[in-house]
Amino acid sequence: MLVHIPNVLTPEQVSMLRDRLDRAGDAWVDGRATAGYTGAPVKRNQQIAEHSPVARELGDVILAALERNPLFISAALPNQVYPPLFNRYEGGMTFGSHVDGAVRVLPNGVKLRTDVSVTLFLSAPDEYDGGELVIEDAYGVQQVKLPAGDMIVYPATSLHQVTPVTRGVRVASFFWVQSLVRSDAQRALLFDMDTAIQRLNASGADTEACRSLVGCYHNLLRIWSET
């Protein structure tokens, strides 16, 4: 399940993050530092050092925005969110096809299962050529290039890549979510049900029927969730 979440950040927030990242200097390091065994050979980009002050400061801005975003909560059903990271592609940089590692270690040593991968775009599409996020899923190959401030949420099990950036600079944040529901198929069903419930409520549909659907939703979540 791929979900496009628009306007996660305001234009003012995007501008602030870009300004801080553009002035980050030595905090930008070789992106291979965080790649796994199979990812490192095909990864050519730069990242903000994972535990640097700028990464924590800007990551907190994103985490606060996620807490206020009902579409993200509905789609990802977050249990734990990995602190957001930041990357930059320019001058032909790319990240070849790979699958994200199954487990990440949080700063406090707790292990996080990567159920959901997230990319938050911080560059406008007309700022760069190339740089599409290409995701292979059960429905084929999806190419993603979103407005600055928009986000794509997709299963971490997906084979994906970032195509070479041939002009300009592509800046983004990326991170992972351990969901309350590890199965993508189950999350997709719950997301569709939640979306339908919201539409029925907005249309003034029969409230008793809506209450019944809400009960079904929460009972399925109770069966499938892991806390």
Curated annotation (Swiss-Prot):
Where Fe cation binds, per the record, is at 98, 100, 160
- Cofactor(s) required for function per UniProt: Fe(2+); L-ascorbate
Molecular function via GO = 2-oxoglutarate-dependent dioxygenase activity; iron ion binding; L-ascorbic acid binding
Chain residues that bind 2-oxoglutarate? 170
Where would I find the Fe2OG dioxygenase domain in this sequence?
80-179
Q: Where is the signal peptide?
A: none
Q: What superkingdom does the record give?
A: Bacteria
Q: What does the entry give for GO biological process?
A: DNA damage response; intracellular iron ion homeostasis
Give the co-factor note.
Answer: Binds 1 Fe(2+) ion per subunit.
What is the E.C. number? 1.14.11.-
Q: Which keywords describe this protein according to UniProt? A: Dioxygenase, Iron, Metal-binding, Oxidoreductase, Vitamin C
Q: Which SMART domains match?
A: P4Hc
Q: Which PANTHER family match?
A: PKHD-TYPE HYDROXYLASE YBIX
| Name of this protein | PKHD-type hydroxylase BamMC406_5004
**What is the species of this protein?**
Burkholderia ambifaria (strain MC40-6)
The uppermost taxa in this organism's lineage are: Bacteria, Pseudomonadati, Pseudomonadota, Betaproteobacteria, Burkholderiales
